[in-house]
């Protein structure tokens, strides 16, 4: 009888310590910078400068610290360019053809994932210890 009481107390302590081994810290600091975006089409490349949101995530797994930094371009809008040209002196003989252009999407997605195993493994060990204690 005393052994099962001691085992139950050990299982409760294991559950409590498993919960305390999980540490989550969040630090938020908004920062923007300028990034150069290179776009290539038909063997011709062009560069544009865009403001971007900087995001840094630090992940520690088995005492190995890895830092991930991402730069997400922010959508910008440009005012329409005003161009004027002199009136033609002669009527053109051919009608100019127009080629429609496609606009790219300016939506950025940032996702974050915390491995479930990091949170579940200590609790699973404590659960097994508790189940073993109840069987004794």
Curated annotation (Swiss-Prot):
Signal sequence region: 1-18
GO cellular component: extracellular region; fungal-type cell wall; side of membrane
Location relative to the cell: Secreted, Cell wall; Membrane
UniProt main location, coarse: secreted
Membrane topology: Lipid-anchor; GPI-anchor
Propeptide: 116-136
Bias kind Low complexity: ranges: 99-110
Region (Disordered) residue spans: 73-110
Post-translational modification: The GPI-anchor is attached to the protein in the endoplasmic reticulum and serves to target the protein to the cell surface. There, the glucosamine-inositol phospholipid moiety is cleaved off and the GPI-modified mannoprotein is covalently attached via its lipidless GPI glycan remnant to the 1,6-beta-glucan of the outer cell wall layer.
Alphabetized InterPro entries for the sequence: Flocculin_t3_rpt
Name of the molecule in the record: Putative covalently bound cell wall protein 22
Annotated gene: CCW22
């Amino acid at each position: 009888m005393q052994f099962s009481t001691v085992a139950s107390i050990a299982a409760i302590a294991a559950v409590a310590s498993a919960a305390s081994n999980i540490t989550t810290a969040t630090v938020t600091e908004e920062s923007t910078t300028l990034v150069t975006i290179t776009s290539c089409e038909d063997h011709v490349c062009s560069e544009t400068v865009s403001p971007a949101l900087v995001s840094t995530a630090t992940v520690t797994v088995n005492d190995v610290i890895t830092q991930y930094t991402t730069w997400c371009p922010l959508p910008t809008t440009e005012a329409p360019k005003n161009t004027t040209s002199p009136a033609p002196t002669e009527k053109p003989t051919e009608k100019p053809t127009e080629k429609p252009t496609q606009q790219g999407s300016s939506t950025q997605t940032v996702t974050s994932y915390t491995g479930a195993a990091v949170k579940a493994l200590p609790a699973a060990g404590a659960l097994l210890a508790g189940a073993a204690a109840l069987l004794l």
